[in-house]
């Protein structure tokens, strides 16, 4: 039986493929509080604060006992009475939930991420598969549907969300190492929206765009993210280094397994008189004293790296 909290909380019987939903939001909060300190006694005072957020009823002890009994009944439905007694242990002044890491979807997720991390450099294909399976455990937000988290639930949710962010970083690294840059573009864009201050996601998106032959869009990611990230962190070393690679057309942008060999195509011969000029990435820098001027991509990069503000025209 598995305690699932990566989404709406429930108890899941893996052999019979049956889920036992908890019967009230208070039970959901209680489960989250106990899983924030697995195999450790959680004092009653903290459980009361978790369930009622400082507005506890007069008979708080009796009300808490009622919710503990309700949770124990739910566990008994999923695992039997003996299992419920072994899981939920009442101690001096508190309650303990006994679980192993594999008894919860959160624990399984963290174990899988740790296993994938050790394989990312030596076996990125394996790491990619492990991370895909691990991320599929998420059915929604942590403890979804319980309303505002109490202090313990909030700590648990923040901890698991941070591991999920790390898992996505590892997944994208594995994807970029195995030629799956085009496959993760939409997920990378979503990650930069969900985590706008995570420089790593923006850097990975720039690399994925370059390897998909969309270097101009990669520069756009830089220009959009630079001010925001600089204001938050003071500097953007990853994005600046990636921009320099684009300007130099570094081999890093076409690593083994990439399906597109370079971020920008090689220069074309000048057009003969009367022929249409080839399409180029052009930038208008309207702050120059000599008026609007069309500039090459490398000139644009020079200004970007020097920190000047630019106004771009259409590509």
Predicted regions and their residues:
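Short amphipathic alpha-helical recognition elements used for nucleic-acid or partner binding
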Residues: 19-51, 71, 200-203
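A short linear beta-strand->loop->alpha-helix hinge motif most characteristic
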Residues: 82-120, 161, 243-247
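Short boundary/linker motifs that mark transitions into or out of structured domains
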Residues: 1-26, 86-94, 264-270, 278, ...
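Alpha-helical adaptor scaffolds
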Residues: 149-195
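DNA-recognition element of transcription regulators
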Residues: 23-32, 57-79
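DNA-binding patch around the recognition helix
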Residues: 1-3, 66-100, 232-235
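Short acidic-capped amphipathic helix/loop micro-motif used as an active-site/signal-coupling element
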Residues: 94, 112-151, 233
């Amino acid at each position: 039986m598995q305690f699932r909290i990566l989404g709406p909380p429930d108890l899941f019987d893996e052999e019979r493929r049956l889920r036992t939903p908890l019967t009230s939001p208070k039970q959901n909060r209680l489960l989250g509080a106990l899983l924030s300190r697995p195999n450790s006694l959680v004092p009653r005072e903290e459980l009361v604060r978790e369930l009622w957020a400082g507005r506890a009823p007069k008979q708080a002890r009796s009300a808490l006992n009622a919710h503990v009994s309700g949770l124990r009944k739910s566990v008994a439905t999923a695992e039997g009475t003996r299992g419920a007694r072994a899981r939920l242990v009442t101690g001096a002044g508190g309650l303990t939930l006994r679980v192993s890491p594999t008894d919860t979807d959160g624990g399984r997720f963290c174990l899988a991420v740790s296993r994938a991390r050790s394989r990312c450099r030596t076996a990125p294909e394996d790491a990619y598969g492990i991370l895909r399976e691990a991320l599929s455990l998420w059915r929604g937000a942590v403890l979804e549907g319980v309303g505002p988290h109490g202090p313990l639930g909030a700590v648990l949710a923040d901890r698991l969300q941070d591991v999920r962010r790390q898992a996505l970083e590892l997944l994208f690294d594995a994807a970029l190492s195995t030629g799956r840059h085009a496959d993760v573009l939409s997920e990378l864009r979503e990650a930069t929206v969900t985590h706008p201050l995570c420089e790593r996601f923006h850097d990975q998106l720039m690399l994925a765009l370059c390897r998909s032959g969309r270097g101009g869009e990669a520069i756009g990611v830089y220009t959009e993210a630079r001010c925001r990230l600089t204001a938050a962190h003071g500097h953007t070393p990853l994005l600046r280094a990636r921009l320099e690679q684009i300007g130099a057309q570094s081999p890093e942008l076409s690593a083994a397994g990439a399906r597109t060999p370079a971020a920008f195509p090689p220069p074309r011969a000048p057009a003969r008189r009367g022929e249409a000029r080839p399409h180029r990435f052009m930038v208008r820098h309207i702050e120059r004293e000599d008026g609007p001027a069309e500039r090459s991509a490398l000139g644009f990069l020079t200004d970007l790296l020097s920190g000047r503000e630019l106004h771009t025209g259409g590509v």
